[in-house]
Amino acid sequence: MTQTFPEGGSPQVLAGGYCPDLNHYSRFLTREIQIGHLPMGGSNPIRIQSMTTTDTMDTLATVEQTIRMVHSGCDYVRITAPSMREAENLAAIKKELRQRGYAVPLIADIHFTPNAAEMAARLVEKVRVNPGNYADKKRFENLEYTATAYQAELERIYKKFTPLVKICKEYGTAMRIGTNHGSLSDRIMSHYGDTPRGMVESAMEFIRMCEDQQFYNLCISMKASNTQVMVQAYRLLVETMVKEGMNYPLHLGVTEAGDGEDGRIKSAVGIGTLLADGLGDTIRVSLTEDPEFEAPVARALAARYEKGEAAGVGRRAAAANNPAAADGSTPAAVNPSGLAADSPITLKGIPATYSPYTYTRRITQPVQQIGGHQPPVVMLDIQAQNLKDPYFLAAAGYQYHALLDKYTLSDLACDFVYMGEQLPSFALPGGLGQIYRYTTWRGLANKQYCYPVYSAAEYLTERTADENGGGGEHLTPAGGAEQHPAAYAGGAEQHPGEATQYPGTHATPQTGLHFVEIDAADFPQALLQQLHPSAVIILHTAAQFGIQQQRAFMVHLQENKLEVPLILKRNYSESDAALFSLGAAADLGALLTDGFGDGICLDAPHIPLQTINASSFGILQATRTRISKTEYISCPSCGRTLFDLQETTQYIRAKTDHLKGIKIAIMGCIVNGPGEMADADYGYVGTGPGKITLYRGKEVVKKNVDTPSALSELIDIIREDGNWIEK
């Protein structure tokens, strides 16, 4: 096979390596491709899609579900075609939809069966193929290849894959080359490992084969259930494509995200991070729910960034000479103005201190439970709460029991509360940090567990007074930082009037912890050099696309070897709880996924405190920076599913949701499990009607277990490993 690439000379590398600009939001300019009557990429809006969960052979049910999906906001609808029978029935589904007046482009989802893909490509507007299982194998074998043998394997795949490419070219059918982290072939795994690089190379092999056939009507995806892996893979894909003169549109999605708020937050972390990078031309949010509930979530995420484009932020060309668009033209580059005010700090290319392709937490020196190797803390703003009633703290994870005069702490107990200038009329739980404005803190008679937060101006004044011998109120160097854990075990008790005593927890001039609130877009540069070793920064931004500002600030700290801990703060005016959670997950998740942030603070005065607290812990869980509950990796269901995924997921959750830190995969069929659940500790996978196979990691423990006894046998496996806890 001779590989050729589009003509046009050497491509221009993106300023941000994987995105047009690290300082401002602007979209990566992709080639426009045609999917039926509805093009994707180029200057088109972000397209929304989902996938049916009906049996593809049930024409009427599939048509009616497709119509519901269209009405919920889907631009495209994907339907599974696991065999020739289902592929052939796509014609009947399409005919019925057209007769009812629905011209929605249909996408055939193919795994394992090239003949079904070739049939579907003649019938529908687009086919999705998985390079990990289209012509390769997955047996979890470690294979060794010489360079000659590896090339021979590529030649074999080329011969098996190119008939589909030729059919797509003949019929005007688009193709998605969709890599899944969990279904990388043994060949790729053996050569590149279970890595984002392996995911990228798996797709690039197929892209090059398509280009060898002069077929360019492609879009690409890099899906994983692990948000860190997913984000890294997409970024690496774009950088790799640009180096080879490619700019294919991207299909974004976090696979097996789960259900409910957890699934939405996890999807928003992964998809939102990439949208903030300017990447993404179509979105599918994978929830273990009916597919019509997915499109509104995807639409809400896309809308946050499309508003930015309407306000003047455009797209930038990926290369000086991009491959021609679908109509043969080359789109012109747009120089976006950006929405946010310019930060005093800008990034010129990817700095040496920061890699967007691997997770490395920013190095900080711990102050009490903040920073270092400790999990990020959660800070809640409770100024607007009823500070005469201790019961409101249940929303923050502290349940007050009047008869016992005690607090019981849940696994979602926040670490700090921001009081501002407000004073409570009751004793807060021992160990719960209280943060007051500096002027209010100075007047407190009892400063136990109470810490000041300074404005930039106040801090510089105090530091100057301290250095001049004026005796700053709080900033005298401490003899040592206090230590106590960032998270509390469920069921722990605290008396509201008899707090646990920790060494040195009185905030006096001889102790350390204090906070300095800084605006990422406007702060005195001299402030950073004045920071005391016991200071913690609260970094906020009012910019719509504040991720770029906050990231630039933290990279600046890295470059100047300033290892001060930092809490990320964002303000939200929304009154819609669902939109708030999605926005916060996208904004904070993007930074936490890159290793930035030692805590988070979400200020949302119109959102219930319990929602803010749950979202905060959910974001940390989704970014895998702080685990506070059981994690479920459950697929969104499709026509291949062998049991009711929604019902089964809820049933398993009800029995296991107290197993903090355990990851359980629930997979409807063998396509994504066991591969996609390789990140899980345990797996529950449908392998036949009424039959379940149970896994410990990648290892099959029990095959073909009858469904009624499968959960109890899974619990037995967890118990054997010493990981079971009675409720």
Please report, for each region that a protein language model flagged, where it lies by residue.
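Glycine-rich phosphate-binding active-site loops on the catalytic face of alpha/beta enzymes
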Residues: 75, 126-140, 279-291, 596-609, ...
